[in-house]
Swiss-Prot record:
DNA binds at residues 320, 325. SMART domains: AAA. It catalyses: ATP + H2O = ADP + phosphate + H(+). The RuvA-RuvB-RuvC complex processes Holliday junction (HJ) DNA during genetic recombination and DNA repair, while the RuvA-RuvB complex plays an important role in the rescue of blocked DNA replication forks via replication fork reversal (RFR). RuvA specifically binds to HJ cruciform DNA, conferring on it an open structure. The RuvB hexamer acts as an ATP-dependent pump, pulling dsDNA into and through the RuvAB complex. RuvB forms 2 homohexamers on either side of HJ DNA bound by 1 or 2 RuvA tetramers; 4 subunits per hexamer contact DNA at a time. The keyword Isomerase does not apply. Residues 265-365 are annotated as: Head domain (RuvB-H). The keyword DNA-binding applies. This is Holliday junction branch migration complex subunit RuvB. Residues 1-191 are annotated as: Large ATPase domain (RuvB-L). Its main location: cytoplasm. It is found in: Cytoplasm. It comes from Rhodococcus erythropolis (strain PR4 / NBRC 100887). InterPro entries: AAA+_ATPase, AAA_lid_4, DNA_helicase_Holl-junc_RuvB, P-loop_NTPase, RuvB-like_N, RuvB_C, WH-like_DNA-bd_sf, WH_DNA-bd_sf. HAMAP family: DNA_HJ_migration_RuvB.
Length: 365
C-alpha cells in the first residue's frame, strides 16, 4: 500500500498550543494502576516494592522518595501507583507553584496521616518553601512566622506524617540538604524497544486501535525510549489510519504516518535534526554552549537540554564536554555529511579522550 505523506496535509495542523478536549482523560486511561501493571523499569519496581511492603508491614509511612530521569518515563505514573499501593490519597503540585513558604504551609496543613504529596519538578521549588520543607520532611512540623521585625513570632505547626514523592529531570540541580532528606532515590532509565512495544499493544487495546505487531515494533523503535512519546505517536498513527486508510495500523500505515509527522527511523524529529544541523553546519561540530545552540534553533536552552539532548547523547550523536557540546561522527553521518578526521566515532570515544559533563548537570555548558 502506497501513501503520499505530503498530499492534502496542512503543516499548520501539526502544532497546537491548546490541550484538545479529552486528551487528559486519554492520558489518565493509559496510566498503569499498579506496580504489576507497570511495564519496564524492573529494578525500580523491585526496589519500590520492597520499600512499600516494608512500610506496610511496620504500619508506618514509607521514607520520602525521589524519582529522577528524563521527561516522559513514568515518574508521575509511579507516584500515583505509590499512593494506590499504600491505599492513600495523592496530593499533586509542582515546584514552580510553590513560590512562597506560605504556599507550602497551606498544602501541608491539609494533609492527613499517610497521604502522599507529589511535587513535580521539585528542583524548581523556591528557596523559602524548600527550607520549610526540610523540617516537614524530618520532623513532620513547620514553623510559621507571624508578623515582621522585632515583633515577629514563630508558631510551630504539626504536620500529619506523610510521604513526599519528588520528581526531577535534573537531580544535579537539587540542593544537598534537600536531596539528603530522601530515603530512597529511583533512577528512571530509557526503555528498551521490546518494552515500548508491550506498552503500545496495551495502549492500543485501551484505545480500541487495531495495531498489528510489526507496526507496534516500528513505532516502538522510533519512540526514543520514552513511553510518553510512544503513546503520542500511537494516537497520531491512529488518526492517519482512520483518515487515509481502513483504520488498521499496518507496517505500511505506521511508516507513512510517521513520515508525515517528521519522525525518522531513529526517532529524531524536526527539532532534533535542527539541533544537529546547527551544531554541525553552523558551528563546525562544536564545541558550543547550550545557550548559543538554543538561540541558533530558536528554542529555550532548557528545551534543548531536557527534551533533545538526553536522546541525542544516548544515541551517541552529541557529547557533553567541559568546553561545550560536540557532534560525533554519527551526527555528521546522520545529516549525510562526511565527518572530519578528528570527529569522535561516538560517545564512548569522546568519553575516553575528554571527560563529559553529567547529562543533567546545569554547569555542563
Amino acid at each position: 500500500m502506497n501513501f503520499d505523506p505530503i498530499d492534502d496535509f496542512d503543516d499548520e495542523s501539526q502544532v497546537s498550543a491548546e490541550l484538545v478536549a479529552g486528551d487528559g482523560d486519554v492520558e489518565a486511561s493509559l496510566r498503569p494502576k499498579s506496580l504489576d501493571d507497570f511495564i519496564g523499569q524492573p529494578r525500580v519496581r523491585e526496589q519500590l516494592q520492597l520499600v512499600l511492603t516494608g512500610a506496610k508491614l511496620r504500619g508506618s509511612t514509607p521514607d520520602h522518595i525521589l524519582m529522577s530521569g528524563p521527561p516522559g518515563l513514568g515518574k508521575t505514573s509511579m507516584a500515583m501507583i505509590i499512593a494506590g499501593e499504600l491505599g492513600s490519597s495523592l496530593r499533586l503540585t509542582s515546584g514552580p507553584a510553590l513560590e512562597r513558604a506560605g504556599d507550602l504551609a497551606a498544602m501541608l496543613s491539609n494533609l492527613v496521616e499517610g497521604d502522599v504529596l507529589f511535587i513535580d519538578e521539585i528542583h524548581r521549588i523556591a528557596r523559602p518553601a524548600e527550607e520549610m520543607l526540610y523540617l516537614a520532611m524530618e520532623d513532620f512540623r513547620v514553623d510559621v512566622v507571624v508578623g515582621k521585625g522585632p515583633g515577629a513570632t514563630s508558631i510551630p505547626l504539626e504536620v500529619a506524617p506523610f510521604t513526599l514523592v519528588g520528581a526531577t529531570t535534573r537531580s544535579g540541580a537539587l540542593t544537598g540538604p534537600l536531596r539528603d532528606r530522601f530515603g530512597f532515590t529511583a533512577h528512571m532509565d530509557f526503555y528498551e524497544p521490546e518494552e515500548l512495544q508491550q506498552i503500545l499493544m496495551r495502549s492500543a487495546g485501551i484505545l480500541g486501535v487495531n495495531l498489528e505487531v510489526d507496526a507496534g515494533a516500528e513505532i516502538a523503535r522510533r519512540s526514543r525510549g520514552t513511553p510518553r512519546i510512544a503513546n503520542r505517536l500511537l494516537r497520531r498513527v491512529r488518526d492517519f489510519a482512520e483518515v487515509r486508510a481502513d483504520g488498521i495500523v499496518t507496517m505500511d500505515v505506521a511508516q507513512a504516518a510517521l513520515a508525515v509527522y517528521d519522525v525518522d527511523q531513529l526517532g529524531l524529529d524536526r527539532l532534533d535534526r535542527s539541533v544537529l544541523s546547527a551544531l554541525v553546519r553552523s558551528f563546525g561540530g562544536g564545541p558550543v554552549g547550550v545557550s548559543t545552540l538554543a538561540v541558533a534553533v530558536g528554542e529555550e536552552p532548557s528545551t534543548v537540554e531536557e527534551v533533545c539532548e538526553p536522546f541525542l547523547v544516548r544515541a551517541g550523536m552529541i557529547a557533553r564536554t567541559p568546553r561545550g557540546r560536540v557532534a560525533t561522527a554519527a551526527a555528521w553521518t546522520q545529516l549525510g555529511m562526511t565527518p572530519p578526521p578528528d570527529a569522535a566515532a561516538g560517545g564512548i570515544e569522546v568519553r575516553v579522550n575528554e571527560p563529559q559533563a553529567t547529562l543533567f548537570d546545569p554547569n555542563g555548558e
